[in-house]
């Protein structure tokens, strides 16, 4: 019986995956810290949930999504990967298969339209 040896990029036997959701303002600081230590990861973005330009949040709001123009600037200058998450952040578990597929495919299409390239 043949042995199967799994390897990650660069021939590494192990890998750590970092992934973050939703395109929030805190991602900009996270990118700076991670890149200082040579870390990379994936941001899972919901393109149907971008707030309007000029949005303001109440003091103390923690989950502050970035508007589209800021999101493009923040992620374009990073070495992190952008991934489709679901267009409206719907729970895919309870959706019919065709609706779940539409959530993912529409998100992917929108992210490509705004210049977020797949890597």
Residue ranges and their predicted role:
Residues 37-119:
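Metal-dependent polysaccharide deacetylase catalytic core of the NodB/CE4 family, i.e.
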Residues 18-24:
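Active-site-adjacent substrate/metal-binding segments within catalytic domains
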Residues 1-18, 72:
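N-terminal pre-catalytic segment of deacetylase/amide-hydrolase enzymes
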Residues 27-28, 91:
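Generic hydrophobic alpha-helical membrane-span motif
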Residues 25-26, 66:
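Short, conserved clusters of charged catalytic residues that mark active-site
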Residues 29-33:
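A short acidic, amphipathic alpha-helical/loop segment
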């Amino acid at each position: 019986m043949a042995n199967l040896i799994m390897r990650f990029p660069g021939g590494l036997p192990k890998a750590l995956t970092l992934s973050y959701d939703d395109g929030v303002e805190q991602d900009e600081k996270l990118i700076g810290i991670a890149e200082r230590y040579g870390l990379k990861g994936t941001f899972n973005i919901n393109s149907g949930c971008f707030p309007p330009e000029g949005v303001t949040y109440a003091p103390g709001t923690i989950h502050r999504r970035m508007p589209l123009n800021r999101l493009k600037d923040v992620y374009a200058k990073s070495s992190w990967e952008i991934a489709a998450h679901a267009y409206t952040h719907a729970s895919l578990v309870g959706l019919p298969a065709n609706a779940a597929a539409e959530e993912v495919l529409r998100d992917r299409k929108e992210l490509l339209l705004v210049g977020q390239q797949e890597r």
